[in-house]
From Swiss-Prot:
Monomer. Its EC number is 6.1.1.16. GO terms for molecular function: ATP binding; cysteine-tRNA ligase activity; zinc ion binding. One of its GO terms (cellular component) is cytosol. This is Cysteine--tRNA ligase. Its cofactor is Zn(2+). It catalyses: tRNA(Cys) + L-cysteine + ATP = L-cysteinyl-tRNA(Cys) + AMP + diphosphate. Belongs to the class-I aminoacyl-tRNA synthetase family.
Length: 465
């Protein structure tokens, strides 16, 4: 089964064939580290971490690069407002970013380059563009000469005349064409700066990704990914810079994830309806948030609400409960019989369907449907009069494997027998004291942990469901 990716560049699904056999070069645009990330910022790391995990599962060696923009206008503004320097703020929010995305199940990239640590190669990249006639200096700023790059607009699928009509020259900009964009910005008084052939300044936003992608992955990469909002102008400008310099295709597959809405409204800071990751993971299990995000295809918009989160949690808990039931029955089952072969064959079909979903442009929504199918099938199997350790182990392994591909964990702390007995005794005392609310709560809590109570004339009995 081959993998097909929807390529924003061609607007169609294409068979994925990497440049080098069994190797994938992947670049994902990272955050500007001036504040905590909100859930919209967190969708790309979760989505493309899952893409990476699936490619690794399929046997590819994935070189995954995701950058940090640790100097730009937003950081300078934050530094001025807080009375701190730019590096201090950047360091703080790099650390906060790692805490948030690690909680959400994301692995570290192969490399997390920072702009400030790669200034030499960025300046060199700009100088080469100037030498080739694709860039020009204007009073300490350096701009990319867009009209010289023939393919400008091919990612956003817009004619250059239309793009130029919608562009404008801002006050203080010294460019020749409204579509030209800054590669280097002359430093204003009091701003952080680096020395360059054009004077003191710092790089523009777009050039840094082109330079760092080239440094760590080469002239041509397999997959370039990011949020839908980056397609234009950021990724369009990356293509122009990189291909003007090298004369080679910059990225062969372009992937973009959809937006997030909050309670059916577009999330935006102006509306004040954005949710910070470090806040929401205090209220909800980070694994639930990831499961929720992956329950919708990555290219589609997703509506985020607490009601939908709770509904999704019910489904996730059903899968975890099935897994817990399987683990509990592992040691008390019989040997494999001919009848068990049918169950193993069905299990293989679910595995195949999961991979077919992921091969189809990483359709995690359909892949998660197969997780539900495995869990439901497992519950049916456990109702059989005779169950085999071999089959149960196969269910357990499959659930663990598929969850790992999605960056999820199945671990569920199981109550010890002594803990169950202690809770039952507490419930008995509550009933003696006519505290029926507490009694019912203990019963319901145990039921949620798959412990079934039965009140009899001889006392309370319990069993694992």
């Amino acid at each position: 089964m081959t993998i097909h990716i929807y390529n924003t560049l061609t607007r169609q699904k294409e068979e994925f064939i990497p440049l080098e056999e069994n190797k994938v070069k992947m670049y994902v645009c990272g955050p500007t580290v001036y504040n905590y990330i909100h859930i919209g910022n967190a969708r790309p790391p979760m989505v493309f971490d899952t893409v990476r995990r699936y490619l690794e599962y399929k046997g590819y060696d994935v070189q995954y690069v995701s950058n940090f923009t640790d100097v730009d206008d937003k950081l300078i503004k934050a530094a001025n407002e807080l009375g701190e320097d730019v590096p201090t703020i950047a360091d703080r929010f790099v650390e906060a970013y790692f805490e948030d995305v690690t909680a959400l199940g994301c692995k570290h990239a192969t490399v997390h380059p920072r702009v400030t640590e790669n200034m030499d190669i960025i300046i060199e990249f700009i100088q080469e563009l100037v030498n080739k006639g694709y860039a020009y200096e204007s009073e300490g700023d350096v701009y990319f000469r867009t009209k010289e790059f023939e393919g400008y607009g091919k990612l956003s699928h817009q004619p250059i005349a239309d793009l130029r009509h919608g562009a404008r020259i801002e006050v203080g900009e010294k460019k020749q064409d409204p579509l030209d964009f800054a590669l280097w910005k002359a430093a204003k008084e009091g701003e952080i700066f680096w020395e360059s052939p054009w004077g003191q300044g710092r790089p523009g936003w777009h050039i840094e990704c082109s330079a760092m992608a080239r440094k760590y992955l080469g002239d041509t990469i397999d997959i370039h990914a990011g949020g839908q909002d980056l397609a234009f102008p950021h990724h369009e400008n990356e293509i122009a810079q990189s291909e003007a310099l090298t004369g080679k295709t910059f990225a062969r597959y372009w992937m973009h994830n959809g937006y997030i809405n909050i309670n059916n409204e577009k999330m935006s800071k102006s509306l004040g309806n954005f949710i910070l990751v470090h806040d929401i993971i205090k209220q909800y299990d980070p694994q639930l948030i990831r499961f929720f995000m992956l329950s919708v295809h990555y290219r589609h918009p997703i509506n985020f609400s607490e009601e939908l989160l709770r509904s999704t949690n019910n489904g996730l808990e059903r899968i975890k409960t099935a897994y817990g039931n399987l683990k509990h029955r592992m040691e008390s089952s019989t040997d494999l019989t001919d009848h068990d072969e049918k169950w193993l064959a069905d299990l293989k079909k679910f595995q195949t369907a999961f991979e077919e979903a992921m091969n189809d442009d990483f359709n995690t929504a359909n892949a998660i449907t197969e997780l539900y199918n495995v869990a439901n099938h497992a519950n049916q199997y456990l109702l059989e009069e005779h169950t085999s350790t071999v089959v149960i182990q196969a269910y357990v392994k499959q659930l663990e494997t598929l969850f790992d591909i999605l960056g999820l964990e199945l671990a569920q702390e199981e109550l010890l027998d002594e803990e169950i007995e202690a809770l039952i005794q507490k419930r008995i005392e509550a009933r003696k004291n006519r505290d029926f609310a507490l009694s019912d709560q203990i019963r319901d809590d145990l039921k949620d942990r798959n412990i079934i109570l039965e009140d009899t004339a001889q006392g309370t009995r319990w069993k694992r469901g």
